[in-house]
């Protein structure tokens, strides 16, 4: 299934919405629309610089019953990857520091408390 520029703009707008909701506006996020193998979207990041690239595939072999819904869910998924990227980076660091790990876990918890509270 080929995706159009219209799909890309919808996806990007959804990402921007979720970045704002999740409090990730301090991140510099770039977007790409290109061919991906076996993925609908992909996020790459450099936590130390708070820079990320979210890539949407130009085509995907699997048809979706509701493409707009799938794109919105995928945008949220990619933004959640950015939210959790500090934890991912710490977990992959062989010089793992429990204090830093706990700090990042609680940062995510505070974000979720704001979103889910009340």
Cite the ranges covered by each PLM segment.
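N-terminal soluble segments of membrane proteins
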Residues: 1, 9-11, 27-32, 38
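Alpha-helix boundary/N-cap detector
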Residues: 2, 6-10, 74, 100
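Intrinsically disordered, low-complexity boundary segments flanking structured domains
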Residues: 13-19, 38-43, 71
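Short alpha-helical catalytic segment bearing the HExxH-like zincin motif
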Residues: 70-78
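Ordered, soluble secondary-structure elements with a strong preference for glycine-centered loop motifs
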Residues: 5, 65-70
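Catalytic zinc-binding patch centered on the HExxH motif and its immediate surroundings
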Residues: 31-56, 60, 64
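Post-HEXXH active-site segment of zinc metalloproteases
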Residues: 49-51, 61, 69-70, 82-118
